[in-house]
């Protein structure tokens, strides 16, 4: 029996496009893709808006094949506490730069404290327009370069501001393989050699979770080697054009040990989002 496949990039929103709002169609397409369980989350540009309505609608969709992430205003940590207390949602999606605030900003201190205390998974996704450079409007660079770069800058800000040191038990998932953050680990470590406090950057980076939406087998292999198989989650970016229709294929192309592959294609997501799931539930029926 193969490992259960769980993809977390199933963006769900009440929009005009059927791909965004028709759960039956979403599950049909995931059947064709070989995905057993989907994780639905808000469209990033709606994060923090109509919080209660979105969270209630998403929670109502939760079931055997559907796990959900909600949304909150990160400057109102009481929203996260209330959402997690409800119990139907195990985490939230936030923009990489919510309301123009980078993730290490003191204004978000309460949010990170609440996220650690409640055990919430915090999925960080770029806003798709994080940089106003005119060149980003050319050649689809706002997406191919701008999106991962936005995540990179804000995650580096989170690390450099000491948030990961203050809250070592945070569960933070970075979209698109963490952007280019892993490739910058040497530069970030060098900066800590010349400036206090001299933290272990490599160890801090390995506290992040990253997804598999990198579109390159060798890039994904590097992520698994650096972060470890227990920190990489399967993603699809469904139904967007830069997503992948068969998300598990790139993982299986790595020819990893079966236990490591099982973690990436489903086990890690279930551990974070469905902690009551028994081990045998993590295998395909």
Model regions and ranges:
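Active-site gating loops and adjacent loop-to-helix segments of metal-dependent hydrolytic enzymes
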Residues: 1-20, 130-151, 188-207
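Mid-to-C-terminal alpha-helical segments outside catalytic/metal-binding sites
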Residues: 1-37, 170, 214-233, 240-285
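Histidine/acidic-residue-rich catalytic or RNA/ligand-binding cores of hydrolases
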Residues: 132-138, 178-193, 220-226, 242-253
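Active-site gating/metal-coordination segments in enzymes
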Residues: 36-154
């Amino acid at each position: 029996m193969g490992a259960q496949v769980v993809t977390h990039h199933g963006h769900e929103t009440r929009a005009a496009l059927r791909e965004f709002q028709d759960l039956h169609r979403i599950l049909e397409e995931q059947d064709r893709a070989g995905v057993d369980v989907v994780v639905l989350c808000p469209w990033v540009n709606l994060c923090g808006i109509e919080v209660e309505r979105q969270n209630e609608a998403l929670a109502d969709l939760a079931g055997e094949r559907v796990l959900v992430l909600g949304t909150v205003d990160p400057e109102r940590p009481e929203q996260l506490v209330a959402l997690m207390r409800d119990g139907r949602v195990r985490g939230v999606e936030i923009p990489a730069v919510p309301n123009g605030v980078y993730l290490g900003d003191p204004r978000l201190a309460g949010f990170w404290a609440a996220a650690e205390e409640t055990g919430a998974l915090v999925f960080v996704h770029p806003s798709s327009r994080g940089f106003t450079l005119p060149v980003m409007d050319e050649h689809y660079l706002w997406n191919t370069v701008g999106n991962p770069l936005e995540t990179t800058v804000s995650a580096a800000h989170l690390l450099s501001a000491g948030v990961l040191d203050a809250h070592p038990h945070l569960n933070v998932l970075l979209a698109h393989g963490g952007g280019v953050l892993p490739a910058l680990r040497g530069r970030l470590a060098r900066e800590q050699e010349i400036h206090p406090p001299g933290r272990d950057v490599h160890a801090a980076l390995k506290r992040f979770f990253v997804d598999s939406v990198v579109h390159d087998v060798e890039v994904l292999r590097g992520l698994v080697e650096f972060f470890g198989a227990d920190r990489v989650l399967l993603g699809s970016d469904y139904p967007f054009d830069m997503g992948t229709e068969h998300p598990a294929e790139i993982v299986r192309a790595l020819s990893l040990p079966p236990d490591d592959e099982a973690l990436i294609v489903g086990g890690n997501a279930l551990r974070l989002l469905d902690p009551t799931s028994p081990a045998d539930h993590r295998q395909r029926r």
